[in-house]
């Protein structure tokens, strides 16, 4: 699915307009298509996530934004400027307005925390006093003011990523690109980095374009998300809407890996595509809003008049809105299934039949 041109606004921070990227193959083989006719707008001031499996085209997409790659066809606009039309001087100016953080921190081991953050300012020719005035507040912002004289080897992974974030902000960019920036971090550190990105977005009004393969990251911090698969945008929208009304199988597969939503291995192994006599149907329920605060399972049991087993589940918030996912099993016979389906419809639940178990 691509973004209709009528939905592309001149006020967007980044616009991909019918972008394709093909890499030549060796030995006369067919060229590899990394991106296929991608159209997408990134709203100014948003935290937008691009999520997909490894090899889906995420990193290629983000490299087009700062001109590290050029599209084979289509155009990429940053603040209304056609990136592909820029000369070398124009690209240098663009890259000063676009910060980037990576999975691997790319710090210089011979430089202190202060020295690493100051590096892009030194390259830009800024004088020492101005560098000091710029770097000190950034170290305060990322919580490393007391570590300014330390070296990377003395710091944790999370602290190293904070240096990377401060360095990316040193040139006062309007846009921050994050390429799997939390993938090498433990869950607790990941949450602290995501909270920092959220605070930077709010306090500096910075647009953040975040590349990840983790739905937990998308859920925690983004306002909008696009799902990419085999070089195509297959689903996009506000994060809450994509989570609660996912339409594409790739999105559903990524959502199934969220904590509390994943099937126990024994159940997953026993799933069948069709029901036999006496089997139970396994259904994933997605509920939100007022439904997330009601005793739905007890009401479901009363409605169907039969046993309902809870296999997995989670209740959380996305963008301050309550959201829940439950995997349940109940009789696959026509009477029980019919009553359950009516209950789901009447209560506005989104359902997905996962299969059948004995």
UniProtKB/Swiss-Prot annotation:
Description of how the protein assembles with itself and partners: The complex is composed of two ATP-binding proteins (MetN), two transmembrane proteins (MetI) and a solute-binding protein (MetQ).
Binding site for ATP: 52-59
UniProt feature coiled coil, ranges: none
Role description: Part of the ABC transporter complex MetNIQ involved in methionine import. Responsible for energy coupling to the transport system.
Topology term for the membrane: Peripheral membrane protein
Annotated CDD domains: ABC_MetN_methionine_transporter
Highest taxon listed in the record's lineage: Bacteria
Recorded name of the encoding gene: metN
Species of origin: Rhizobium meliloti (strain 1021) (Ensifer meliloti)
Disulfide bond annotation, renumbered to this chain: none
Catalytic reaction equation(s): L-methionine(out) + ATP + H2O = L-methionine(in) + ADP + phosphate + H(+); D-methionine(out) + ATP + H2O = D-methionine(in) + ADP + phosphate + H(+)
Gene Ontology terms: cellular component: plasma membrane
Keywords: Amino-acid transport, ATP-binding, Cell inner membrane, Cell membrane, Membrane, Nucleotide-binding, Translocase, Transport
Protein name (record): Methionine import ATP-binding protein MetN
SUPFAM superfamilies linked: ACT-like, P-loop containing nucleoside triphosphate hydrolases
Occurrences of domain ABC transporter (ranges): 14-255
Annotated family: Belongs to the ABC transporter superfamily. Methionine importer (TC 3.A.1.24) family.
Subcellular location: Cell inner membrane
A single MF term (Gene Ontology): ATP hydrolysis activity
EC number: 7.4.2.11
